[in-house]
């Protein structure tokens, strides 16, 4: 068996093929210069392919994983239902079923039929839907717990759950789904906190090799962690424990929260190393790492029987 390696990538990216402000080639160049191993160009309702037309790779790096943001805007356009299809083999036309749950489910199904995995994007964008809807959806592999677009309301608000709370509610309902951090990048020419710039959120996939199949499989099986700036030097997840080590610069303070069913805090650990021994009655266990800089990282849940 080949040794597993870690590969960093962004799975939510826009170009001038939809509503981004720079060309696909220049966008890919930005991620190459910043040492990303793989990239999904996820233009709205468009499959932006730079590698596959000639049957050979156009760029040495990053690896291009085919994708699309399947975008249905229902109820007169006021409710955006946007779902990334990752690893798809063809364009997926959005389906507008008018009802939120039916629209999500129809587009998830269409992505799977196109050979991809489905990532539910920014549920709090325009307050489109929350855990109540997602509890009724089957087949989705991923959910954005962090989205770098400044208007996606990831932290929620009065009476509105945060993306983390939505994730915990869906997990508590028994729906297995993995949490991703993404850029949702649109702006490469103008940089400010009010713009959707690259480099804000990413996933780090553990795989045997850097290939489309290996990366998509790693995402589908939860063999990754998500981050907005924290790097893990070690991550060991087994049915009996979660152990991690944070890359430390000697100044930043880190703390890790282990979370179980119902969003319950199981343990909080301050420092570079954190470990949780699984008891078996937690429902699931996942870890969130926080830094004094404001950066975060998320491990994927270990699912436990009743």
Report each predicted region and the residues it spans:
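C-terminal functional module detector
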Residues: 1-6, 24, 173-178, 183-306
